[in-house]
């Protein structure tokens, strides 16, 4: 009986292992498909599954910026206001203050002027606290605005809202320029401040990295969601209208989460997850690699095992059938369990899923499932990065330039197995020689610091 139950469970794991396999040849295919989709998205609007949004950021901060700059980070039920004092190459960020403010629920579905009025009044209070040290000499204060909702950007400091996501539904803001709305609200507060850049958090990650390291060419977010932005040559963007920027460069926000390709290793669990999601058929790459979904994929595998095998004993499946009850931090803790009897795995299974009295053999199987799902995610993320590097001719044999990738997000920062797998996969795909010139760096707070730095790099007072 026991042997049959174990064999049935092992069959499920063996099938998962095979379906999630990411040999180098397959990952090379993913990288090539990513580079191809990128080129198609740059050629024309709507030319690709990935949007390849022109950010209008043509200068990245390089450490020489000076002065006091502000940032507003709006992306969820809270927003953040931030103030940074920059003192050039030698001292960099000399002071940094921030404040987080909760948005009252009624404002998230009210009207536009109420929401932006509330934000502007919080900004005005924050500015009032800056003390006597701030010398503006009749200069306007400048702000970088991180707005983490879909926008059709029309210039560095203007963009119309395409639609709200998360818990927001303010109909009269859709189709309006969010910068103009904020600017108007600030004027009503008597606040003399100019929005000098509208960005998204991934562009901010690239900027925050680039401020400390001028070799950074790609910014990636690997957290609850996933995205990448990178520095492209402006003359390689056929859809870019008007004259090319003086710098010759343009930051592109890829929106790579929506990438999909026949090269991707997709299982029955991924297909079911996608079908039951709020956006079926969309964000396929993100659903394979981001922190929002890894725990949920593992839960679905465990549920199948419980249906095909009695390995978990006499189990009430209520918890195991609850979507998203297993989060990525939970699988990370199980994956990193170093106790000889995998005690932490036993505790997690009991606490989260009411799976009790597991054998050591069963717990090892659970760790293996976490490993299979996480390795696939990390290796696919690495292949995506290699696709971007190849698109811009970096990290290829003969290229001696140093290329650094700035990565932000809890999945990369806190999930050690994920991070190590991503880094070794990069080396494997780039090859020993080329990988010597490619490095990965953690870059924190693109949405706050990054926005303030882009405001500084695009200040109206620069010569």
Curated annotation (Swiss-Prot):
Residues involved in ADP binding: 76-78, 224, 410
Principal subcellular localisation of the protein: cytoplasm
Occurrences of domain Hexokinase (ranges): 7-456
Family the entry assigns: Belongs to the hexokinase family.
Keywords noted in UniProt: ATP-binding, Cytoplasm, Glycolysis, Kinase, Nucleotide-binding, Transferase
Organism: Oryza sativa subsp. japonica
Name of the encoding gene: HXK7
GO cellular component, as recorded: cytosol; mitochondrion
Subcellular location: Cytoplasm
Gene3D superfamilies in the record: 3.30.420.40, 3.40.367.20
Outcome of substituting residue 76 to D: Abolishes glucose phosphorylation activity
InterPro entries xrefs: ATPase_NBD, Hexokinase, Hexokinase_C, Hexokinase_N
Top-level EC class: transferase
Catalytic activity: a D-hexose + ATP = a D-hexose 6-phosphate + ADP + H(+); D-fructose + ATP = D-fructose 6-phosphate + ADP + H(+); D-glucose + ATP = D-glucose 6-phosphate + ADP + H(+)
Region called Hexokinase small subdomain, residue ranges: 62-199
CDD domains for this protein: ASKHA_NBD_HK_plant
Region (Hexokinase large subdomain): 200-445
EC number: 2.7.1.1
One example of a Gene Ontology biological process annotation: glucose metabolic process
Induction (UniProt): Down-regulated by glucose or fructose treatment in leaves and immature seeds.
Pfam family, one: Hexokinase_1
Residue ranges of coiled coil: none
Pathway in which this enzyme or protein is active: Carbohydrate metabolism; hexose metabolism; Carbohydrate degradation; glycolysis; D-glyceraldehyde 3-phosphate and glycerone phosphate from D-glucose: step 1/4
Chain positions recorded as D-glucose binding sites: 165-166, 200-201, 227, 255, 286
Tissue expression notes: Expressed in roots, leaves, flowers, immature seeds and seed coat.
Stated name of the protein: Hexokinase-7
Role description: Fructose and glucose phosphorylating enzyme. Functions in sugar signaling via a glycolysis-dependent manner under aerobic conditions, but its signaling role is suppressed when oxygen is deficient.
MF terms (GO), sorted A to Z: ATP binding; D-glucose binding; fructokinase activity; glucokinase activity
